[in-house]
């Protein structure tokens, strides 16, 4: 079987074939850190964290980069409003991002570069683009990329250069040769932070930062570039143009984009003022309900947000959580069940769904199906059947999607001598036919995560290596 994903550039579902067999290198556009993240910001973080987990589950080594844009007009404006340095604003909201990420159970990427740590490399990249005639210096010291010099401009977004009109996210300036030319370097303005460059003091443009950081950490050509669909144009289009102009090589092999969170007909956005913060959502509805909301629709489709929808999602999540809690009260120390045809078939359905363009709604449906069957198995006293379903929900499906996760409950000990002494006492009890106490010791060790087996060759024991710590 193979993994298929929709590539924005081709508009088609394509088989994932990494540049290096067994290794997937992916870059996910991260937040501009001038405020707390909202549900819309959280969607790509949750979706592509889960996608990375699935790739790892399928045996890939994943090298993931997610950036922080820590210098930007919005950050500067926020710093001026506070009367502090821009770095104080960025540092504050990066720290707050990590709190929200932890509360949502989002794993860190392998690298989280910050724009200001790569200014030297950005200047070097801009110099090369000027030398190759893809960029020009304006009279005021701005440096712009000339889109007409890059013949494939518009390929990612499916737009023709002659049809493009400078619009909502394109900065218009008389200094440009073409309205669609975009800034690689912005000349310093009064009250702004700046860095030295051959064209005078200034700071990086928005698009060049992601090109430089991704290529420095993943190489000139890597596998997957991901982010929200609102970034396709101009941000990702501009990234692709300047990166390929710089190296003469393909930039990202696959482009994945998630749909927007919609509220009252508009995209959830700080600029519109219709945001709902992640921390407020987790506090009101719970982590699992928030992630259930974000994963219940296919990642490429928009999701309508309202408190009524979230309330209903919370009720659905609580049904699952109550079932899991009921199981844990009934069977406090569940181990790993024996694999059988049922488990293999369910896991095959799980894999089939996620290999088909990461179809999380199908997996969510499987979780609800398993939860219903889990309740039935408990009602009928079928412990092993219940354990299979609990295990699939919490340690397979849940572990990959980052939702309803549970690990094996283990009291950790590395003290082999203590365990051996306990087993020695138990063996003496068995010789004296005091099986009742011997069995109590066995059960106590099992609850502590020590599995023992009485064989014809004596008693053997092991710590469960599948514990999710």
UniProtKB/Swiss-Prot annotation:
ATP binds at residue 270. Its EC number is 6.1.1.16. Zn(2+) binds at residues 29, 210, 235, 239. Binds 1 zinc ion per subunit. Keywords: Aminoacyl-tRNA synthetase, ATP-binding, Cytoplasm, Ligase, Metal-binding, Nucleotide-binding, Protein biosynthesis, Zinc. One of its GO terms (molecular function) is ATP binding. Its cofactor is Zn(2+). A motif ('KMSKS' region) lies at residues 267-271. GO terms for biological process: cysteinyl-tRNA aminoacylation. It is an enzyme of class 6 (ligase). It is found in: Cytoplasm. Pfam families: DALR_2 (PF09190), tRNA-synt_1e (PF01406). GO terms for cellular component: cytosol. InterPro entries: Cys-tRNA-ligase (IPR015803), Cys-tRNA-synt_Ia_DALR (IPR015273), Cys-tRNA/MSH_ligase (IPR024909), Rossmann-like_a/b/a_fold (IPR014729), tRNA-synt_1_cat_dom (IPR032678), tRNAsynth_Ia_anticodon-bd (IPR009080). Its main location: cytoplasm. It catalyses: tRNA(Cys) + L-cysteine + ATP = L-cysteinyl-tRNA(Cys) + AMP + diphosphate. SUPFAM superfamilies: Anticodon-binding domain of a subclass of class I aminoacyl-tRNA synthetases, Nucleotidylyl transferase. Belongs to the class-I aminoacyl-tRNA synthetase family. NCBIfam families: cysS (TIGR00435). Monomer. This is Cysteine--tRNA ligase. It comes from Thermosipho melanesiensis (strain DSM 12029 / CIP 104789 / BI429). The gene is cysS.
